[in-house]
From Swiss-Prot:
4-CDP-2-C-methyl-D-erythritol 2-phosphate binds at residues 9-11, 35-36, 57-59, 62-66, 133-136, 143. It comes from the Bacteria. The lineage of its organism: Bacteria, Pseudomonadati, Pseudomonadota, Gammaproteobacteria, Enterobacterales. One of its GO terms (biological process) is isopentenyl diphosphate biosynthetic process, methylerythritol 4-phosphate pathway. The keyword Metal-binding applies. This is 2-C-methyl-D-erythritol 2,4-cyclodiphosphate synthase. It catalyses: 4-CDP-2-C-methyl-D-erythritol 2-phosphate = 2-C-methyl-D-erythritol 2,4-cyclic diphosphate + CMP. Transmembrane segments: none annotated. The gene is ispF. Gene3D superfamilies: 2-C-methyl-D-erythritol 2,4-cyclodiphosphate synthase.
């Protein structure tokens, strides 16, 4: 059985948290506003994985009203969600992620991001595709007010 999941996340710049994408700290003059570490890649990926497995969403699994998730490393959340999903017999076929931001450029960090995901999901980096794009200065992302990420996953069981 094939199962497809789709995830989306967005965070506003302007907070005091460092910019973390895919578990990698990215130098940036603007911080992120968030309850956890604000890692849009991890958050959208968790939502995609949970969606494919029909296990709800990141907000119900890790509510921002629960203090134990304040400042938490989203890689830990990914590992917890993935353990729940694999206990149901799901296997990961592939991941396709698009990070949408005007600044900073992240292409030089993509290999590190893929490596983190492959470690956390116990899969090959060849099963993971990450790309970055801009909005050509349009909208809140184009004005460098925020960052967004879309993740699509294919699971089998």
């Amino acid at each position: 059985m094939l199962r497809i999941g789709y995830g989306f996340d967005v965070h506003q710049f302007g907070g005091c948290r460092p910019l973390t994408i895919g578990g990698v700290s990215i130098p940036c003059m603007k911080g992120i506003k968030a309850h956890s570490d604000g890692d849009v890649m991890m958050h959208s990926l968790i939502d995609a994985l949970l969606g494919a497995a029909c296990c709800g969403d990141i907000g119900s699994m890790f509510p921002d009203t629960d203090a134990k998730y304040n400042n938490i490393d989203s890689r830990k959340l990914l590992r917890i969600a993935w353990e729940k999903i694999t206990m149901q017999g799901f296997l990961l076929e592939n991941i396709d992620i698009t990070v949408i931001l005007q600044i900073p450029k992240i292409n030089t960090y993509i290999y590190q991001m893929k490596h983190h995901l492959s470690q956390d999901l116990n899969c090959s980096v060849t099963s993971i595709n990450i790309k970055a794009t801009t909005t050509d200065t349009l909208g809140y992302i184009g004005r460098s007010e925020g960052i967004a990420c879309i993740a699509v996953v294919l699971l089998t069981r």
